A protein has these predicted regions:
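Loop/turn-to-beta-strand initiation segments
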Residues: 172, 202-206, 243-249
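Short glycine-rich substrate-engagement loop in P-loop NTPases that contacts/grips substrate
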Residues: 173-202, 229
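Structural recognition of the conserved hydrophobic beta-strand(s) that form the central parallel beta-sheet
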Residues: 208-210, 233-237, 246-252
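Pre-Walker A (pre-P-loop) alpha-helix and adjacent loop at the N terminus of AAA/AAA+ ATPase modules
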Residues: 99-146
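A short helix-turn-beta junction within AAA+ P-loop NTPase domains corresponding to the substrate/partner-engaging
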Residues: 260-278
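Walker A/P-loop
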Residues: 144-175, 195-202
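C-terminal alpha-helical "lid" subdomain
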Residues: 5-18, 24-30, 40-44, 49-113, ...
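Substrate-gripping "pore-loop 1 plus following alpha2 helix"
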Residues: 220-241, 275
């Protein structure tokens, strides 16, 4: 008699899931086919939850693969302007001599694609493809989008995304913070904006305008009503004049503060959300390098950082690495690491997760074991707590009785 053991009955699916995620980080056609077979087998066995987990891994891997580094070579004849060099002098504020911009050249930009979900990835891929052949578009009397507003919570990777886009276009990035362009000298702010745009329009580059909401903050000052009108008008006029010259990217953490006239100037309005669980796991693994941390540790860090930004996840991983440096992987108490982080960064962790971590350990283990977005196995919980599986099983049973 032949006994068939289903994946569902193994209690090791989280490990299989982690192996699939690691394999799909740089997949071959054969690897992808096997993960797809496993997904289909789970569907056939009537386990849609685990099949959905593998489908998410496949979708996210496809997104990262689509955004893999592939610098575009834009013909000099299709994009006007002179070539920027390291010797090019950036414009400065006439009164204070403060530089109005910083130049980042393509060779200084990391080729590693930022990690986002499938929808954001597809949108970015579409933008880059439209810039791939400007001459082909010109034959149909169309052009790629020349203005893009990227908005979202602080730490979600907006600036990194804009920088990476410039690197993929193989163009220098002229970075200007709008708050630094605003001067206390009457009329100087408008002049600074005009000087910045004149500089960017002269050269083949991507213009990045950071801290866009600083104009709205100035607008709240009743003594600055006249000045802010001049500044906003100068900005709108210069955005209009640049639309036929090159790509302009605006970044803001507070889109609700922007004037509607400013919104209309941007052909693309891209919201960068906080990462979901799958992306948090990918970010945790990326930030963990070069350390090969246990998969259970990485999964827990991703699960506990629900609602966190990429920057906050990176900060937690740094705390984890510091603990490793002092204690080593065999001595690290992962829950203590997270408690330490949650104490120092209490505003970055959800109240629900903090209550679990600082509360009864059995209740935390039960929440992990029954997590809707991918339960933790008894073996994983034992690895997280540093206890044997039988002890963990007793803790789970006690927590169920109490519940």
């Amino acid at each position: 008699m032949t006994t068939t053991t289903t994946i569902e009955g193994m209690d090791h699916f989280p490990i299989i899931q982690a192996l699939c995620r690691a394999a799909m980080a740089s997949p071959s056609v054969a690897v992808r086919r096997q993960v797809e077979r496993l997904r289909d087998a789970l569907i056939a066995e009537g386990d849609p939850k685990q099949a959905k987990a593998l489908a998410s891994i496949l979708d996210n891997a496809e997104g990262v693969q689509e955004m893999a580094p592939s610098r575009l070579t834009i013909s000099k004849t299709s994009l006007p302007g002179e070539t920027l060099s390291p010797n090019t002098q950036v414009p400065v504020d006439r009164e204070t001599s403060t530089p109005l911009a910083e130049i980042i050249f393509p060779r200084q930009i990391n080729d590693q694609a930022p990690l986002f979900g499938p929808a954001i990835t597809a949108a970015i891929k579409s933008l880059l493809e439209e810039w791939r052949d400007l001459e082909a578009l010109a034959r149909y009397d169309v052009a790629p989008p020349k203005t893009c507003l990227i908005y979202g919570a602080p730490g979600t990777g907006k600036t990194r995304l804009a920088t990476w886009i410039a690197g993929q276009l193989d163009l220098p990035l002229v970075v200007a913070r709008l708050d630094s362009l605003v001067s206390s000298f009457l009329g100087t702010s408008s002049r600074n904006i005009g000087t910045l745009f004149s500089f960017a329009n002269r050269y083949r580059c991507v213009l990045l305008l950071d801290e866009f909401d600083s104009l709205a903050k100035l607008r709240d000052d009743p003594q600055e009503v006249g000045e802010i009108k001049r500044v906003v008008n100068a900005l709108l006029q210069n955005l209009d004049s640049r639309k036929d010259v090159g790509l302009t990217i605006g970044i803001t953490n507070h889109p609700q503060l922007l004037d509607s006239a400013v919104w209309r100037r941007f052909e693309i309005q891209l919201e960068v959300p906080r990462p979901d669980l799958a992306i948090r796991q990918d970010l945790t693994r990326q930030f963990m390098a070069p350390i090969d941390a246990p998969a259970a540790h990485q999964r827990l860090l991703a699960w506990l950082t629900e609602g966190a930004t990429g920057a906050e996840i990176e900060a937690l991983v740094r705390t984890y690495k510091r603990s490793l440096a002092f204690g080593g992987p065999e001595k690290i108490d992962l829950l203590d690491v997270f408690r330490h982080f949650a104490t120092l960064h209490s505003g970055r962790i959800s109240d629900e997760k903090k209550a679990l971590v600082f509360g009864n350990q059995g209740e935390l283990l039960l929440a992990l074991h029954e997590a809707q977005d991918g339960k933790f196995s008894t073996a994983e919980l034992a690895e997280i707590t540093g206890r044997d599986k039988s002890t963990v099983s007793r803790q789970l049973a006690a927590a169920r009785e109490k519940d």
